[in-house]
Amino acid sequence: MRLKRLELWWRALWIRILVRLMRRPSAAEARPEWGSRPFRVLFLRHDRAGDMVVSSGVMRGIARSHSTITLDVLASPANASIIDGAEYVHEIVVFDKKRLGDYLPTLGRLRRARYDAVVDCMVTAPSVTTLLLILASGARYRVGIAGRGNDAAFNVTVPPETRAGAHMIDLLAALAGAFGVALDESERHPVLAVTDEEQKRAAAVWGSGFRALVNISAGTSERNWSDSRYVAVMKYLAERNPDVVLRVISSPSEAGRAQRIAHDGGGEYARTPSIRDAFALIATADFVFTPDTSIAHAASAFHIPTVAIYVRGKAERWGLYGTVGESVEHSEPNFETLDVEVVTAAISRVLSASLSRPA
């Protein structure tokens, strides 16, 4: 506990130091005329895969807000490939914040790019790394959400989303206001694309029938669900629809576990060497079941009927968005006592609802 308090104190100290170094320019230049000349804008999203997915619609909205804007994205090794080929992204800068050797080259690259504006992706709390990147970019305009205790670091601020229980996508959408646009739900909705070749490879994994994809990897221990319960879900899907084709995916580190679950549940394990391989399987599925991960966000992006399971307090901000599905939130901080019957009841409702979904 004492070590944690020291860590928080040290982080807060660095944030105060960086904010003082980043004192905003005069009010006279606080609001750019985005349509008046070309602007090169950098959106910072150097974190997890799911964060990139939930930001994708907002990034596209910013890029399309004015024909004069060229949008680059600072990504991490974990999420850079997600936006490969995205028509709204000009250039992807990959930065690994866990590698000290990446800092100086990346900071130098940002400075040489001469960005006109940089957008802070941290919409709920400030980040030392993000503030450092903003400072290093040398961008004249610094765009961020107001009210996080670091307003002095920005000269283009927008008010936060204030609705109770707002989804992370809605919190991020507030950033578009800095560019003079208000994104509706369809415009802020996550957007992903897979190539024809990726679709072809995914199609080869599926047989004929109702395509049900089960992801068993959750990323953190509290979101682990027992093998037997995943098997029970698969058997329920087979009982409900004898024509079902069951495929199981996982992170590479859990391949052995996924193979056992697939075998016991009457399905097959599908290798996904990259996250784009997983996304292609989602895009071609008829139904997805997953714990709270980027897989759930990708299913939202592709509008695939989905049931996703969440630990207490997570579904509201990180649940499914704008697709047929249910975000099942357990009452406990882990999945140890999450009953199969609760999940299969949700699956039944979602599958019934998806029958009336427009083709």
State what each model feature region is.
Residues 1-359:
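Catalytic machinery of carbohydrate-active enzymes
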